[in-house]
Amino acid sequence: MKLENIELSFDNFASEMSKLKNQKHFDYLVTIIGEDFGEEGYGCIYILENTDNNERCSVKTIAKKVDGSDVIPTVVNLWKSAELLEREVFDFVGIKFLGHPDMRRLFLRTDFNGYPLRKDFDMSPEANQFPLTDEPESDFTVEYSLNADGHLVATKKRLFDDEDFVVNIGPNHPSTHGVLRLQTVLDGEKVKRIYPHLGYIHRGIEKMWEGMTYPQTLALTDRLNYLSAMMHRHALVGVIEEGMGIELSDRIHYIR
């Protein structure tokens, strides 16, 4: 499937994304990919799908530099799934999404220094010492916006009300089938909100791959998910083969 590739500027990004959702019925946000585009700056690629006809498009936008930070308007108001996807981009690339209600890290510790998927990230062991203390806890998050003068404003927001009862499910719990922590906010027996903490077994595979040859990366795809190791390996190999223009024999197709 070939994607229609769209490039949007910072100024028309919010309005054009709204048109794609509401007028062209791209109702499914498949993913958001944060990228370090070198001299272009930091930006995102959004993969959208129209679930009526299965048409897909990709949207690229470059973040605007404001007061030393890279910012892009949030699309949480259009696609609710963007809430976690934008937090992941912020966590690894450092882009702040204007209007996002909960701009915290998602995978890495709150006291982690830097954004590891930036090309200039310092990979030295001295700069990435394993912390010996517990992760700092906070009942607050932050929302970013631009004021009338175009400056970046950080607004502190509470995560919990005074009467909220918070239960931690995980990091290790038999019902989660994996290592994650769910801060579950209860009102009596009703679940009001869940704040996920997802980075307990995150190993930085994306960053490790940057210094490897293609064959060396194959063992790491198998470790992404023990239920679908072969599927991940086929996905990576397929992209490499297509990019190199390799024609596969019938034997390979049959084996796969």
Language model segments and positions:
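Terminal low-complexity/charged segments
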Residues: 1-190
